[in-house]
Curated annotation (Swiss-Prot):
Its cofactor is Mg(2+); [4Fe-4S] cluster. SUPFAM superfamilies: Adenine nucleotide alpha hydrolases-like. It is found in: Cytoplasm. Homodimer. Binds 1 [4Fe-4S] cluster per subunit. The cluster is chelated by three Cys residues, the fourth Fe has a free coordination site that may bind a sulfur atom transferred from the persulfide of IscS. [4Fe-4S] cluster binds at C134, C137, C225. The lineage of its organism: Bacteria, Pseudomonadati, Pseudomonadota, Gammaproteobacteria, Lysobacterales. It comes from Xanthomonas euvesicatoria pv. vesicatoria (strain 85-10) (Xanthomonas campestris pv. vesicatoria). One of its GO terms (molecular function) is tRNA binding. Residues 1-20, 282-305 are annotated as: Disordered. The keyword Magnesium applies. GO terms for cellular component: cytoplasm. This is tRNA-cytidine(32) 2-sulfurtransferase.
Length: 305
């Protein structure tokens, strides 16, 4: 009896035995994944157009470093030409290492500017001791950056908010403001003068942290508000971290849901015409009673009263 030998299996690429090689391979995969996610977000929301001048708001934190790094890499192979300028707002915080960002940016060869504005003194004077400074600090910082964009021909303002920021903002609005709202990947500023983009909208914070560590970015901690405890955001952040541990994929599903809104399955009358639903044929809308009439009827005395 002739024995049937099994067919030889194709040889897979052997895993590197050297831990350093394994780490390098993992870092390479991570970088490619981030590039793909950033490129997808730019494409999905039309974030960058030919000839755009994109201002990358660089704080010295892991998110903005990663944002700049990704855009620099994509710029070299992007389907459209665009320029970049990195802008940091020096808020005159005590002990702020003002030399770090200029040295880093000169090493990259990227155009940059340092905008000096003493928002630290303003925030410290206005906000009572022990209170979170984040809200006022954010408004002042945004105003200074918008002013720079207005006077320097910037067409897009790129911020470093990531997927977890967007989901956390959704829950903060839900829990504390009773509204369904998050952070838009692309928006026009309230004054209508600026277009703001968030190219990291599809990127997990954990991936950004790992990438920043691998790239050894010179992280600058925020001594004004970044080290303060914003209780609401902290609580939501812990909730998302718990879900990530116990229910992998749940936060990703929530993020995807923000792009699949069904107004007819909610209760916002400004988004869906519930009054027209079920109206027969071409019946004019003026045949519907004034909604206030139903309220009046509910409060009217009964015949037996």
């Amino acid at each position: 009896m002739t024995a049937v030998l099994p067919l030889p299996q194709p040889l897979a690429d052997p895993a590197p035995r050297d831990p350093r090689q394994r780490l390098q391979r993992e870092q390479l995969r991570l970088g490619k994944r981030l590039q793909r996610q950033v490129g997808q977000a730019i494409a999905d929301f039309g974030m960058i157009a030919p000839g755009d001048k994109v201002m990358v708001c660089l704080s010295g934190g892991k998110d903005s470093y990663t944002l700049l790094d990704m855009l620099l890499q994509l710029q070299r192979k992007a389907p459209v030409p665009f320029s970049l300028v990195a802008v940091n707002l020096d808020q005159k915080q005590p002990d702020f290492p003002a030399h770090v960002l200029p040295a880093y940016l000169r090493g990259l060869g990227v155009p940059f500017d340092i905008v000096e504005q003493d928002t630290y003194s303003v925030v410290s004077r206005v906000i009572p001791a022990g209170k979170t400074m984040c809200s006022l600090c954010s408004r002042l910082r945004r105003g200074a950056l918008y002013a720079y964009a207005q006077t320097h021909g910037v067409t897009k303002i790129a911020l470093g908010h990531h997927r977890d920021d967007i989901v956390a903002t959704f829950f903060m609005n839900l829990f504390h403001h009773a509204r369904l709202a998050a952070m838009a990947p692309k928006l026009r500023s309230d004054d209508g003068a600026h277009v703001v983009i968030r190219p990291l909208a599809y990127v997990r914070e954990a991936d950004i942290a790992a990438y920043a560590q691998a790239r050894q970015f010179p992280i600058i901690p925020c001594n004004l508000c970044g080290s303060q405890e914003n209780l609401q955001r902290q609580q939501v952040g812990k909730l998302l971290q718990q879900w990530d541990r116990e229910f992998p994929g749940r936060v990703e599903q929530i993020a995807r849901a923000l792009g699949d809104v069904r107004p007819e399955q909610l209760a916002d009358r400004t988004l869906f015409d519930f009054l027209a639903l079920g109206r027969s044929g071409d019946a004019p809308s003026d045949v519907d009673p004034d909604p206030s009439a139903w309220l009046s009827a509910s409060h009217a005395p009964h015949d037996s009263d």
